[in-house]
């Protein structure tokens, strides 16, 4: 900055010197022509030249000032460049110093890594020894578990045979029940009854209608119980499926257990479907009895005969079934403790006794003698009311 001020002062001094020279020249010219009046025109020319000279001096002074300004700027830039060069040299020194430090650190790191590698190698050798010991121990454990699973598999085979025998027995009972139902339906179409009995059972019919509603409600509750048992069996089926993945060695035995669980689930679903169909049949028959007042006298007599015959046949057939089921339960009691879990759940569900609120019976809650009696009584009551009206 001081250098720039000095250059500006130098330029002003030169400008003043040039201006003074021009002034002297003008004075000389003016003195030469002062006494010559005839040369006024020439004096004007000189003045014009002086003016031109002054303008030229001003231009030169401005150009000189611009040049000095440029020189000052270049000098400043040169100083900046010198400073940057100094900074770069300092950075170069720092980089060389850092490079040396990095080399020292790299050598130290290499030595540390070599030491760690040696330690790691020793540790791997020790780990290899431990691994061999663990493998021998694992082999012994696998052999032991295999023997245990083999024993469990044999036990499951025995339980499966017992369960299969129980399932076949229940299937025979179910088939016998279905045959009995078909026989009742065939006998119902052929039997006849008396119309006068409707008047004698009027009071029974009044109470029986309410009993029918309670029996229907009990049937619905039984349906819910079957659905709950189905859900429990489904959960148990899922549990058996998850336990199947515990050991590859016991895969075959667990697969058989899973298949047995699926069969039990299908059986429960079939029982539920049958219960639903019977419940719908009861509701349909009840609805037909409600609409019985629209029948003719002949149709009323036929319907009354059918209902009474059905009630009688059902009572006899279901009494026989109750005796057979009691005998079957007595024969199956010693094997109850060894049955597998899936069949135990199904047996408990099928053997569970239920008491109807109207009669206190413990027979099949979906199609009982009491329910048939109620339906017959309700039909008779509807016919009698039609006659009285």
UniProtKB/Swiss-Prot annotation:
Q: Name one GO biological process term.
A: phagocytosis
Pfam families hit by this protein: Gram_pos_anchor, M, YSIRK_signal
Q: Which superkingdom does the taxonomy of this entry point to?
A: Bacteria
Propeptide at 360-389
Bias (Basic and acidic residues) ranges: 93-147, 157-182, 194-204, 212-224, 236-246, 254-270
Question: Annotated region Disordered: where?
Answer: 93-182, 194-224, 236-271, 326-362
Entry keyword set = Cell wall, Coiled coil, Peptidoglycan-anchor, Phagocytosis, Repeat, Secreted, Signal, Virulence
Localisation per UniProt entry:
Secreted, Cell wall
In the bilayer, the protein is annotated as: Peptidoglycan-anchor
Give the compositionally biased regions (Polar residues): 342-362
Output the Gene3D superfamilies linked to this UniProt entry: 6.10.250.460
In its keyword annotation, does this UniProt entry include Transcription? no
Which N-terminal residues, if any, form the signal peptide?
Answer: 1-41
Q: Could you tell me which residues carry Pentaglycyl murein peptidoglycan amidated threonine?
A: 359
Q: In chain numbering, where does the motif LPXTG sorting signal fall?
A: 356-360
Kindly indicate whether the keyword Nucleotide-binding belongs to this entry. no
Family affiliation: Belongs to the M protein family.
NCBIfam families reported for this sequence: LPXTG_anchor, YSIRK_signal
Quaternary structure, per UniProt, is:
Homodimer.
Q: What does this protein do?
A: This protein is one of the different antigenic serotypes of protein M. Protein M is closely associated with virulence of the bacterium and can render the organism resistant to phagocytosis.
**What protein name applies here?**
M protein, serotype 49
Which source organism does the UniProt entry give?
Answer: Streptococcus pyogenes serotype M49
């Amino acid at each position: 900055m001081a250098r720039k001020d000095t250059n500006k002062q130098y330029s002003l001094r030169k400008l003043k010197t040039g201006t003074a020279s021009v002034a002297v020249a003008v004075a000389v010219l003016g003195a030469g022509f002062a006494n010559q009046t005839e040369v006024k025109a020439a004096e004007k020319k000189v003045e014009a030249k002086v003016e031109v000279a002054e303008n030229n001096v001003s231009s030169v002074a401005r150009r000189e000032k611009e040049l000095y300004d440029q020189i000052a700027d270049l000098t400043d830039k040169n100083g900046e460049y010198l400073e940057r060069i100094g900074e770069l040299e300092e950075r170069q020194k720092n980089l060389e110093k850092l490079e040396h430090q990095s080399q020292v650190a790299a050598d130290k790191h290499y030595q540390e890594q070599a030491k760690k590698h040696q330690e790691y190698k020793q540790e791997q050798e020790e780990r290899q020894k431990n691994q061999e010991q663990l493998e021998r121990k694992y082999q012994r454990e696998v052999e032991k578990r295999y023997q245990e699973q083999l024993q469990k598999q044999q036990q499951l085979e025995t339980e499966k045979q017992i369960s299969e025998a129980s399932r076949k027995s229940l299937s025979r009972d179910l088939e016998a029940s279905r045959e009995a139902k078909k026989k009742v339906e065939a006998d119902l179409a052929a039997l006849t009854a008396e119309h006068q009995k409707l008047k004698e059972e009027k009071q029974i019919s009044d109470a029986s209608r309410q009993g029918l509603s309670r029996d229907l409600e009990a049937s619905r509750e039984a349906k819910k119980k079957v659905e709950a048992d189905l859900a429990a069996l489904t959960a148990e089926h899922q549990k058996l499926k998850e336990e199947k993945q515990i050991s590859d060695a016991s895969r075959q035995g667990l697969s058989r257990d899973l298949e047995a669980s699926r069969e039990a689930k299908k059986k429960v679903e079939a029982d539920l479907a049958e219960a639903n169909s019977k419940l719908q049949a009861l509701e349909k028959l009840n609805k037909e009895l409600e609409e019985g007042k629209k029948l003719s006298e002949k149709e009323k007599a036929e319907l009354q005969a059918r209902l009474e015959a059905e009630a009688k046949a059902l009572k006899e057939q279901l009494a026989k079934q109750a005796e057979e089921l009691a005998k079957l339960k007595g024969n199956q009691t010693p094997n109850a403790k060894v049955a597998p879990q899936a069949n135990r759940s199904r047996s408990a569900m099928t053997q569970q006794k239920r008491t109807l609120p109207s009669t206190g019976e413990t027979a099949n809650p979906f199609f009982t003698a009491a329910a048939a009696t109620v339906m017959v009584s309700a039909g008779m009551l509807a016919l009698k009311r039609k006659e009285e009206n």
